[in-house]
């Protein structure tokens, strides 16, 4: 199976207080993970309202899975653990019993219906009958799908799907082409959510309760405007620029 774990890691948050705990940490409303919409994008901010992480979040049963780049996942997991206090929550970085891969909209039709039904809407998820596998349609101008779940079942599903010669996808390329941001070590604590368009892709909810950094994010929304916005462009260079470099 192609390994996308060099681009994408996962933090598992479980326990009876998991939803309440996550709600106080992220820019989006975790209660949106309903039966109709089981996935969201969300930011995780410092007290200054600047992004420390950008998550794709999905859920299987009462377990929440926060996807982010592996270069920050362990540190973010440890930071989240600092705020658990007395909450009945367990946080696990890179759980051993899960796996995942990506396919695009041209190949999703090759997935046999008897394996798992296909979601019809962006950021909607469907579950296999035994709830061991989740299939989520990602957002963007072109649809991509994240197949995620129990590692043994994912391996079986992958072998069945790829017998039809489906080609795997690149997570970072998907984000770039669909104007979805990401936060890496080099870009942590540099940008407020609006600077990388989180408010434009539904990753910030201005009606939810408090979370770390909310005051700065809300003040920009209601009283001002962001000094920066994210755009897609291309340039020819002799070498790749460092992440977070200024463009002049």
Where are these regions (language model features)?
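Basic, glycine/lysine-rich polyanion-binding surfaces/domains
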Residues: 1-207, 211-248
């Amino acid at each position: 199976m192609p390994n996308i774990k060099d681009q994408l890691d996962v933090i598992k948050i479980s326990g009876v207080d998991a939803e309440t705990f996550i709600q106080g940490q992220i820019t989006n409303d975790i209660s949106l993970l309903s039966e109709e919409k089981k996935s969201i994008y969300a930011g995780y901010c410092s007290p200054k309202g600047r992004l420390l992480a950008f998550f794709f979040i999905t859920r299987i049963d009462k377990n929440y899975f926060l996807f982010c780049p592996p270069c920050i996942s362990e540190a973010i997991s440890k930071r989240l653990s600092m705020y658990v206090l007395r909450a009945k929550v367990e946080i696990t970085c890179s759980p051993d019993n899960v796996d995942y891969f990506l396919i695009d909209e041209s190949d999703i039709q090759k997935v046999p219906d008897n394996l798992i039904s296909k979601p019809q809407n962006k950021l909607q998820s469907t579950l296999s009958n035994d709830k061991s596998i989740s299939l989520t349609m990602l957002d963007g101008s072109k649809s991509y799908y994240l197949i995620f779940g129990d590692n043994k079942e994912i391996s079986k599903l992958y072998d069945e799907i790829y017998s039809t010669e489906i080609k795997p996808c690149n997570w970072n390329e998907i984000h770039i082409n669909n104007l979805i941001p990401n936060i890496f070590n080099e870009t942590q604590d540099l940008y407020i959510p609006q600077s990388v368009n989180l408010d434009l892709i539904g990753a910030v909810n201005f009606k939810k309760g408090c979370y770390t950094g909310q005051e700065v994010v809300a003040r920009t929304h209601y009283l001002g405007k962001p000094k920066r916005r994210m755009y897609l462009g291309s340039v020819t260079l002799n070498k790749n620029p460092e992440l977070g470099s200024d463009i002049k």
